[in-house]
A protein has these predicted regions:
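Nucleotide-activated chemistry modules centered on ATP-dependent adenylation/adenylyltransferase
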Residues: 1-238, 244, 250
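Composition-driven recognition of long, low-complexity, acid-poor segments enriched in small hydrophobic
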Residues: 230, 234-274
């Protein structure tokens, strides 16, 4: 069995041989970093991953260099079957390629940092991080590490994740990495605001006006498309003596009230309404 393998600190990829047919399951002898989830330990491993300004810096309270930290997580995750990925990807030259990857450390870090971002970042900044991630990955994948865009993205990530500092507990079990909880001195979570019970900081009655305004676009659209709002406009104009105004409004009101049709029937209906 012939496989093409590429390995770096972050992952190892496997292609070729039986993997060239997307219908084939990856043979067990493909994998090098991870054990089969079925053969992984029956007892989960719970670790604590520490972050400073969005960068993982420690495992279970012990500081590591970036390289040593990823290597440590690769070892722990691989032992528990974490980090297997089977994808059909799009190569830069246009063809599709099926490959399987092993990235235990990357899987653990991604699960943890997303959890910590949710706790410490405002909604818009966190969403922008998620939007930029695929583009950043494309730049790296296609060999454009030194592209100005990549440097600009790094500048955004550095600024946006300045307060992504804290600890995340992650459970490794049978091929999964699951965040169990997170804490941070910069947490934006307020129990007083989030509680479903009585709160001195948040009056649930305040939401009534917000709900009315938030639903206003949908309400107006529903009225217009059902003909109710247009009909009221015509009635109001007619009752106030504005004959010309009412006459001008009448065709659009009829169209709004008319059921939506297509083709010849639509043209015929429009002609009837406008004459």
């Amino acid at each position: 069995k012939i496989y093409s393998r590429d390995r770096n600190l972050w992952h190892i990829s496997h292609e070729g041989g039986a993997l060239e047919d997307p219908a084939n399951s990856p043979p067990e002898d493909v994998w090098m970093l991870t054990v089969s989830p079925e053969k992984a330990p029956d007892e989960p491993r719970i670790l604590t991953l520490g972050f400073e300004a969005g960068v993982p810096v420690s495992v279970d309270g012990k500081k590591h260099s970036p390289e040593a930290l990823v290597a440590k997580l690769n070892e722990l995750g691989g032992f528990h079957g974490v980090g297997r990925v089977d994808i059909c990807e799009n190569r830069l030259v246009g063809m599709k390629s099926r490959g399987v990857y092993e990235t235990p450390g990357g899987t653990i870090i991604l699960e943890a940092v997303r959890t910590l971002r949710a706790l410490t970042m405002d909604r818009d900044s966190a969403r922008m991080c998620e939007k930029l991630m695929p583009d950043y990955a494309d730049l790296v994948y296609t060999g454009r590490w030194f592209a100005p865009l990549r440097e600009a993205m790094d500048a955004y990530f550095r600024e946006a994740t300045r307060f992504v500092t804290g600890d995340v507990r992650v459970k490794l079990y049978k091929g999964t990495a699951t965040a169990l909880g997170a804490s941070s001195p910069y947490s934006l979570y307020s129990e007083d605001l989030a509680t479903f019970g009585p709160s001195a900081k948040y009056d649930h009655a305040d939401s009534k006006g917000f709900v009315r305004l938030y639903g206003l676009p949908g309400m107006v659209a529903a009225q217009v498309r059902s003909g109710k709002r247009a009909g009221k406009s015509v009635s109001k104009a007619a009752s106030s003596g504005g004959g010309k105004t009412a006459k001008a409004l009448l065709p659009s009101a009829k169209l709004a009230a008319a059921p939506i049709k297509t083709g010849k029937a639509a043209k015929k209906r429009a002609k009837q309404v406008l004459t």
